[in-house]
Amino acid sequence: ALYLPPAGGYRLGDLLTVMARLRRGCPWDRRQTHHSLRPYLIEEAYEVLEAIDAENPDMLCDELGDLLLQVVFHAQIAKENGQFDMEDVIHGVSSKMVHRHRHVFGEEEAETPEDVMRIWEEIKKEEKGQETQTKVLKGVPGNLPALMRSYKVQEKASQVGFDWDRPEDAFKKVEEEVQELKKACESGSKAEIEEELGDLLFAVVNVSRFYKVQPELALTATINKFIKRFEYVETQSAQQGKKLEDMTLE
């Protein structure tokens, strides 16, 4: 039967109907599972970030729609498996937000963003019961990008006092790890180089955390800056009739 869009535009309920029909009528959509959709979920999340960085509202609206589609897709698969549906997802997250914002929906007081985060963490501990701090660290999702995961692990460790006293101490650790990496490189051992490089990156993340700079975003900005510089050099080489290999990035 011919599908006719609703008068006055689509709403969330219409998207659920569209997805249910896609699962019945499209061979590709029908074949998908939670696992097969993982790359698309990650890709769409990063495209949302790109739209935010571009400060383009139309692009952001479009990319948020693509990300929402992934959420609806997973909810539909779960519904078909008799596990949960989109209403359960909405109910769960709404209940969580109300419960964890007692300063808005209850009588708790929070004057600063730091107060809010303290209350948030306290409520999370109440919900999960008494946990060892190691279990808390292991609770940071392993699928996060490594820089982001490092930041969150260090942040949680610092909440129980496992941290440097001053930013200067974190800087000294970076300098120490640089020297150890140099020695590893001199040894020629790939295993040692990999280990020391990991230690150095972890130490650099610690510095970024002290200054509340997200290392993942900082590195992304640097990558974009490098690409712009490369584009400039390539343009200059073409204008000067030179080979790109003869140019430098300086």
Located regions from the model:
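Flexible "arm" and connector segments at domain edges
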Residues: 1-2, 6-63, 69-197, 201-250
